[in-house]
Amino acid sequence: DTTAIIKDNKRIGTAVIARFDFNTQKDEQILVNTAISGVSMEGAAKNLQAEVPENDFDKYLAETKANWNRQLGKIEIKSDNENDKVNFYTALYHSMIAPTIYSDVDGAYYGPDKKVHQANGWVNYSTFSLWDTYRAAHPLFTYTEPERVNDMVKSFIAFYEQNGRLPVWNFYGSETDMMIGYHAVPVIVDAYLKGIGDFDAKKALDACIATANLDNYRGIGLYKELGYIPYNVTDHYKAENW
């Protein structure tokens, strides 16, 4: 459905796009600075001013290249096989695509309760595909991105406080419920056991226990009553419950 609905002077709908036409000459290049916010147009403007204050494409291209080289340079491998290097650093790059920052430069973010919240002194993250990532990607982050792991756990705790459950598959501040298990738990435990960050361990533990005891979540009530449910689900819950 690509039909936009106008409500409160805003266009809403599925697959709605914005189109801009510029009166350019042949081979003319134009420079357009854009920014986004999960909160407001004002937030997007603040993000743009903070992150791209100058109209200098080449400067930001050079900074972006330097940032990626610094990120990928956190792990150095030695090999005479160029294909091995390409495969390794491509995989390392892929590991850095998500999670994504979901708070504005002023700390404001849109929570799962559809309210605007404030992250003071930390960065709110989203895009947690936890069934896919708790086994390898998140343990990797504890070595390559420990300061981000701290903020990720704080994001989990905030999500629990606003949603009543730790995230399962958090995407842009909302719960998609596309996966089984509640794999935020092993991510939290791994960070705690490695002594990472200053997140509130008591709040984190309370969130883990409360999530594990939600009878109405995907068979947990039967799991608690019988000690088992279909084996493929039990296999995933064991990672959280042991």
PLM regions: where:
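Acidic/polar, glycine-enriched structural segments that form the non-catalytic walls/loops
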Residues: D1-N124, A158, R165-V168, D198, ...
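Aromatic-rich carbohydrate-recognition surfaces in CAZymes
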Residues: S126-W242
